């Protein structure tokens, strides 16, 4: 049986460990808050990135799904869509002045990637502005954010004048940023659901 002195020492030890645990939690929350205060500005400045994911295009007449690989390097934007067994559906490149689409064995050119994609495939996707809406750093007066400043929803016009409702369902934290992992774009009766993973930055 332990003595009264041993019992008190043990109680003090338990209390000390408890307070150390609380202090560690408080420090962790403080570090997370510090990271949050700057993450959105830094993320908006990141112009070189790559992300993989899945995409579902839903309209009243059809539903199509694909894997996506999306890359941006400065002003160059490159989107590749493949089937779930890896067969390439299309690749779309946008530079400062030119858009190039490889689709169905043919090569097409325009000045606007969003318009080119819609004209030849019927697939509406605001490719030109992906650097902002895909990362969730879009800046618009209709933007709604959560308590951490992450985008929740926005009503926004793309480069061709189409109005989109974008809903951000979930985020993942990586490299000090909150990055969208699930989002939905809606234009009239067209809905595009996107799941993103494996964000990479250079």
From Swiss-Prot:
Intracellular or extracellular location(s): Cell outer membrane
Topology in membrane: Lipid-anchor
Classification via CDD domains: LolB (cd16326)
One GO-annotated biological process of the protein: protein transport
Coiled coil: none
Residues in the signal sequence: 1-24
HAMAP family hit by this protein: LolB
Main location: membrane
InterPro entries (alphabetical): LolA/LolB/LppX (IPR029046), OM_lipoprot_LolB (IPR004565)
Entry's Gene Ontology cellular component terms: cell outer membrane
A Pfam family recorded for this sequence: LolB
Residues anchoring lipid (S-diacylglycerol cysteine): 25
PROSITE patterns in alphabetical order: PROKAR_LIPOPROTEIN (PS51257)
N-palmitoyl cysteine lipid attachment residues: 25
Protein family according to the UniProt entry: Belongs to the LolB family.
Function according to Swiss-Prot or TrEMBL: Plays a critical role in the incorporation of lipoproteins in the outer membrane after they are released by the LolA protein.
Keywords assigned: Cell outer membrane, Chaperone, Lipoprotein, Membrane, Palmitate, Protein transport, Signal, Transport
Protein name as catalogued: Outer-membrane lipoprotein LolB
Subunit structure: Monomer.
């Amino acid at each position: 049986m332990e003595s009264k002195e041993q019992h008190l020492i043990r109680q003090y030890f338990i209390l000390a460990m408890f307070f150390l645990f609380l202090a560690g939690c408080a420090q962790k929350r403080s570090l997370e808050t510090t990271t949050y205060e700057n993450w959105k500005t830094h993320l908006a400045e990141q112009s070189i990135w790559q992300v993989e994911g899945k995409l579902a295009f839903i309209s009243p007449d059809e539903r199509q799904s694909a894997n996506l690989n999306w890359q941006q390097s400065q002003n160059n934007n490159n989107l590749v869509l493949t089937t779930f067994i890896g067969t390439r559906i299309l690749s779309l490149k946008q530079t400062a002045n030119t858009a190039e689409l490889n689709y169905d064995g043919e090569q097409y050119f325009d000045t606007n990637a969003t318009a080119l994609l819609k004209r030849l495939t019927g697939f509406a996707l605001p490719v030109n502005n992906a650097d902002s809406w895909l990362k969730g750093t879009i800046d618009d007066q209709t933007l709604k954010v959560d308590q951490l400043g992450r985008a929740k929803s926005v009503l926004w016009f793309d480069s061709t004048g189409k109005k989109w409702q974008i809903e951000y369902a979930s985020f993942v934290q990586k490299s000090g940023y909150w990055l969208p992992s699930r989002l939905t774009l809606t234009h009239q009766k067209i809905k595009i659901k996107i799941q993103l993973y494996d964000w990479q930055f250079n």
